Regions:
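Short glycine-rich anion-binding loops that position phosphate/pyrophosphate groups of nucleotides
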Residues: 15, 44, 73-74, 99-102, ...
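Short acidic, Gly/Ser-rich segments with clustered Asp/Glu that frequently serve as metal-coordination loops
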Residues: 15-23
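Alpha-helix C-terminal capping segments
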Residues: 81-88, 115-126
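Glycine/threonine-rich flexible loop motifs
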Residues: 102-111
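Glycine-rich phosphate/pyrophosphate-binding loops
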Residues: 121-143
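Electrostatically charged, flexible surface regions
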Residues: 142-207
């Protein structure tokens, strides 16, 4: 189990350090602890999966107190966050998100949000990936209501119980208002319909 009160929490995402989701997650984390740090990509890195920037030098920028950006991937952010930004004391917990869009089924293999939690797992730190689904085609109108309403309680419950050190947690919120959520379910990873995995050619040889 993880004691959230006064825990050292490292937060990242794949939507960028100024994205709405990571700001919401940071605010929720700060309800548990003052020792909350954000190290996140300077620009959106959705679909980066578990890539590490071996070929490029990375620029770490302090954007505000305990808020850093890196011109790299979410996994870069976890690696540098642990080894440099928080080198005096490792984080007790890693939170990755809140992602714009769900991370379920085979999509988890593409996700930078998921990969950041996996990087934390590799480094033997309890890690949780968090995603907020939205209605198809309405990413700009995403509602964070269910995340805001339920996440604090879910984090409290799962960290109190704890989980196997060889797994990370993956939380997904539906795109309905919180009063429409019927239950919270613990489940296993499923499969998606691959018929929509089509890459369209918009112009000649332009995809």
């Amino acid at each position: 189990s993880v004691k959230l009160e006064n825990a050292r929490i490292l937060i990242t995402n794949d939507d960028g350090y100024s994205a709405d989701g990571i700001e919401i997650l940071t605010d929720i984390a700060k309800e548990f602890s003052d020792d909350v740090w954000v190290v996140a990509p300077e620009h959106e890195k959705s679909g980066a999966s578990h890539a590490l920037s071996f070929q490029n030098a990375l620029n770490l920028k302090e954007q505000a107190d305990k808020l850093y950006s890196i011109d790299g991937t979410p996994s870069d952010c976890i690696a540098i966050g642990i080894s440099h930004v928080l080198k005096d004391k490792r984080p007790d917990l890693i939170l990755s998100g809140i992602n714009s869009g769900c991370n379920v089924g085979e999509d988890v293999t593409y996700s930078g949000t998921i990969a950041a939690a996996m990087e934390g797992l590799i480094r033997r730190i309890p890690s949780i990936a968090i995603s907020q689904n939205y209605e198809a085609g309405k990413k700009n109108l995403i509602s964070w209501d269910s995340s805001k309403h339920f996440l604090k309680g879910i984090l409290t419950d799962i960290t109190n119980v704890g989980w196997d050190s060889n797994v990370f947690m993956n939380i997904n919120f539906p795109y309905c208002q919180s009063d429409k959520v019927k239950s919270i379910q613990i489940t296993t990873q499923g499969n998606r319909d691959t018929d929509d995995l089509i890459i369209n050619e918009v112009e000649n040889n332009l995809f």
